């Protein structure tokens, strides 16, 4: 029973279920004896291109009788004066009707398939009588906002008499303009009389910027008495016939407004008119833009005063009538030239839906998927940033052929995957300045241009990497990227960025990450290993995640490649850690080196002078910078030795108060440490610090954690048992040995110069 009830409803309301995608002019007007051309649009699918097209007339009971169709049928009334032409490549068909009569007035439908179905559009045709035949007057027609010149002949007898033009009303004819200089207030600065000479028996009345209210009957007169020459004038003001524009949902449309060279330097506007209300400005050349079109509209001035407006990411509410015009204030006003369009937005679109807003955190990244017409797979694709300029503009940032804006180096990439109808844009290292609107554009079908809004919000990036890494020429490099547990099932990758994209590199999974303590079992470290670093390895590297063909978050690392300074000790391997862990590891490493090796400060000074870890050195650095660094190092070395001696002296004082000493060997320097100072026996063991290099050993001394990075494997051996000596004797002997080593080092630094030190 329910199925029968549903079938009855569908039979009664066949067009309620969906909006018809067929679109045409709502009203068509003409006069007897002339012809009309009616264009109807349909979605250019394969089925629609080959489906029957028809033009039918609606009867009193709602039935639509076919008059002409694409299958060759023509009714008797249309034989010899009508035809229907299909244009499948553009998704349109045109009905031409000639020799119109008043009987042709009525309501019609243009449609596809069977006339009883809902795939059609209602059209009203009105045919009126020729006004010239009806009024026996001289008919002048003029477009709204244009100029009309009315010629008024007269006899020689009235050549010296007053010439005038008046407009008829129901009871009178009020003066518009005359040859004495009078001009009505309604026509001020718009109307004047022109007399070419005494030998010419014609005077002209010129009316500029014609308004709709100017339409009507006029009397052109020479003389004021009974012998005056009079001519009846019928002035018809034509509103612009709206041009039909058919756009798919989420697609783009362009309005080309050509108002003529006479208004080339006058400000232009485009306004939208809905439900017979006022025409609200969408954009004008003075910088005004409607909020509803923010970020998805631009205007482009062209030659000869042409004003072109492009609107992207069409919405259902964008449908309606649009009017462009020229007016000094950039606002709609009667009496200025205009051009009109009727926009229909088809909801049955082939353009896939995509997010209109994407969000990313400061320092993080966003990924934008841009659709394009699959037929344009080989066309150039690019991404531009919409700017709030006077006319709105969208300068390109990156394209499929390479990066355009240098300030986006290492941050922006456009990735294409042929065949799937989309390309991907990735932007990382986000800042607040990246907030705004962006366009996805191709050189092919401009209807596929789309807009996305980028918002930068508070938060922390999900992927953890160091920002800058220094790699040594000829040595191995390991870059580590920490992924949180939410990306456990995602594909992870490393790639090397270039201005043409990001080339994938082989990676290895290092197991759980210590950077995310809330879900260690699911967080991961994925590393990139370079066995032997070359100068070509310098540049930007990205780590990221993918879920199938879709790209996710990314993080960027800059790798600077440098040569080691002569005399420096080489680390076995450079291992990059997350930014936070790297800072802690670096602090511990410096503290331990100061205690273990007096030459540390000299080494650090040389490293800093060479550039140190981080971004590339400034190419504009002065040439005298190297000499200044050498002098600075020469000054700092003695100061550093004094500081180190002070640290050791403090250690000696503390050592005198320690008892029950066990001996631990640290390189060549031996220190007595009380077993009671250790918190537990596990502190004797070296542990890998995940934020530092593999050789970092962690030891707890007096409640402080210090990290010492060794350059060679430390071997611990038991010493033979010797006679027990006092703590004071051991400390004095160690201090004396240290002072001798410091003195020798200072002498070597003075003789060999700061570079050797």
From Swiss-Prot:
Transmembrane segments: 633-653
Entry-linked InterPro entries: CD300_family_receptors (IPR050671), Ig-like_dom (IPR007110), Ig-like_dom_sf (IPR036179), Ig-like_fold (IPR013783), Ig_sub (IPR003599), Ig_V-set (IPR013106)
Sequence positions bearing Phosphoserine: 665, 674, 681, 727
Pfam families named among the record's database cross-references: V-set
GO MF term set: transmembrane signaling receptor activity
Protein's UniProt keywords contain Protease: no
Key word Transmembrane present: yes
Disulfide pattern: 40-110, 56-64, 152-220, 257-324, 271-279, 370-440, 384-394, 481-543, 485-519, 495-502
Domain Ig-like V-type: 19-126, 145-237, 250-341, 353-457, 461-560
Region of interest called Disordered, as start-end residue ranges on this chain: 607-627, 679-730
Modifications the protein undergoes after translation, according to the UniProt entry: In the absence of dimeric IgA, Ser-727 is phosphorylated which allows PIGR to function normally.
Record's signal peptide: 1-18
Highest taxon of source: Eukaryota
Tissue specificity of this protein: Found in mammary gland, jejunum, lung, kidney and small intestine.
Stretches assigned to the Cytoplasmic side: 654-757
GO cellular component, one term: secretory IgA immunoglobulin complex
Positions annotated with a glycan in the UniProt record: 83, 420, 468
Extracellular side stretches: 19-632
Biological process according to GO: immunoglobulin transcytosis in epithelial cells mediated by polymeric immunoglobulin receptor; signal transduction
UniProt keyword terms in alphabetical order: Cell membrane, Disulfide bond, Glycoprotein, Immunoglobulin domain, Membrane, Phosphoprotein, Repeat, Secreted, Signal, Transmembrane, Transmembrane helix
Biased composition (Basic and acidic residues): 679-688
PANTHER family: POLYMERIC IMMUNOGLOBULIN RECEPTOR, POLYMERIC-IMMUNOGLOBULIN RECEPTOR
Domain description: The Ig-like V-type 1/D1 domain contains three complementarity determining region-like loops CDR1-3, which mediate interaction with IgA and IgM.
Subunit structure: Interacts (mainly via CDR1-like domain) with dimeric IgA. Interacts (mainly via CDR2-like domain) with pentameric IgM.
The name this protein goes by in its record: Polymeric immunoglobulin receptor
Annotated organism of origin: Bos taurus
Gene field: PIGR
